[in-house]
């Protein structure tokens, strides 16, 4: 195969590779510019399907370098169909998503966030995103607004004079940050990003803080990006630099050892991308997690291509993002996306 045969530009939306068959000379020798899905019917032995497929192999290339996710058949047949549907509907976003995951795998957090943001800005000007945005605008225009506005700041900040996370801990103060857009299920808007970044910047400068607790008010921790703000930016370069300048992701990563995030209900998009940078995520049993952005013609843009692979690996991240499917707290705990389930 040559590069042209492996690219979404030439109409190759994805590649399917049977991991139960021996490698052939026709298999890719470089990273294809489209998602590569490995399929296997081998029993799950606790070892990853890729590890099983490589054992005893003398392949001239490392399979894991270009297989983006592995599907276990027949158990994940429906999931495979969901993934193919997403890729087919948004091939450019899907190819960009797996490309970013591949490239950021060995980068630092700040470097990864730079790559993610540049890719996100690029896709904001893509036909796939513009089509999704147009379709959504037509739908929203037919639905009357009924919600009342939330009152007060979009991030509630409170400082406690002593740590209260553990009765045995008596040193240092605790900063609590609560997302406060309950009627919008704490949809992550520009104002929330800016207020969260401001509070975290202050926390970074305050060495007397021992703990930081982040939570959300209302029925959901965070239902993802505020869709009413999607497509508003007219300057992709300015939007990119704004994301890097006011970056809760980068700040949470710097403060991670101090941070506990308590999540519940919907944890969509930014609602899991940001917590994944923290040292500890405590989830209520009703928590659900999803990365729907590829279906919009975008990629996760709140740091998820950097934070989530560090918890669950590149392939599970690709599986989550390309399917758009949600997982419950139990699955998230098995993968390592969260650290504990607690009411």
PLM segments and residue spans:
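Crotonase-fold acyl-CoA enzyme core
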Residues: 42-87, 253-270, 274-343
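Catalytic-core regions built around general acid/base machinery
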Residues: 26-29, 199, 244-255
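Crotonase-superfamily enoyl-CoA hydratase/isomerase domain that binds
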Residues: 79-141, 306-335, 339
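Conserved CoA-thioester-binding segment of acyl-CoA-metabolizing enzymes
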Residues: 1-30, 134-217
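Terminal peptide-recognition signature
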Residues: 97, 177, 181, 195-196, ...
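Short, active-site-adjacent cap segments at secondary-structure transitions
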Residues: 98-99, 219-222, 268
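Structured N-terminal alpha/beta-domain signature
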Residues: 1-96, 100
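Glycine- (often His-adjacent) and acidic-residue-rich active-site loop
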Residues: 46-48, 61-63, 216-248
């Amino acid at each position: 195969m040559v590069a042209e045969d492996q690219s979404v530009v030439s109409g190759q939306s994805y590649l399917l590779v049977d991991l139960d068959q021996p490698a052939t000379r026709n298999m890719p020798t470089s990273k294809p510019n489209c998602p590569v899905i490995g399929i296997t019917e081998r029993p799950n032995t606790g070892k990853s399907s890729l590890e099983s497929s490589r054992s005893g192999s003398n392949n001239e290339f490392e399979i894991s370098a270009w297989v983006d996710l592995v599907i276990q058949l027949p158990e994940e047949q429906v999931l495979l169909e969901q993934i193919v549907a997403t890729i087919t509907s948004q091939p450019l976003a899907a190819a960009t998503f797996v490309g970013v995951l591949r490239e950021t795998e060995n980068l630092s957090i700040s470097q990864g966030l730079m790559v993610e943001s540049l890719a996100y800005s690029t896709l904001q000007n893509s036909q796939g995103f513009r089509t999704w945005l147009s379709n959504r605008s037509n739908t929203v225009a037919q639905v009357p607004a009924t919600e009342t506005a939330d009152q007060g700041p979009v991030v509630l900040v409170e400082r406690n004079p002593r740590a209260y996370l553990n009765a045995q801990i008596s040193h240092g103060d605790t900063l609590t940050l609560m997302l406060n857009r309950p009627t919008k299920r704490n949809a992550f808007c520009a104002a929330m990003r800016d207020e969260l970044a401001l509070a975290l910047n202050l926390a970074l400068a305050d060495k007397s803080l021992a703990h930081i607790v982040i939570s959300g008010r209302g029925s959901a921790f965070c239902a993802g990006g505020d869709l009413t703000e999607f497509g508003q930016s007219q300057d992709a370069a300015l939007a990119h630099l704004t994301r890097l300048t006011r970056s809760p992701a980068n700040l949470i990563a710097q403060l991670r050892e101090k941070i506990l995030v308590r999540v519940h209900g919907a944890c969509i998009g930014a609602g899991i991308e940001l917590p994944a940078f923290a040292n500890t995520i405590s989830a209520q049993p009703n928590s659900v997690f999803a990365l729907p952005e590829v279906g919009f013609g975008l990629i996760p843009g709140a740091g998820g291509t950097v934070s989530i692979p560090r918890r669950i690996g590149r392939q599970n991240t690709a599986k989550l993002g390309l399917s758009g499917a949600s997982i419950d707290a139990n699955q998230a705990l098995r993968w390592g996306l969260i650290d504990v389930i607690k009411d």
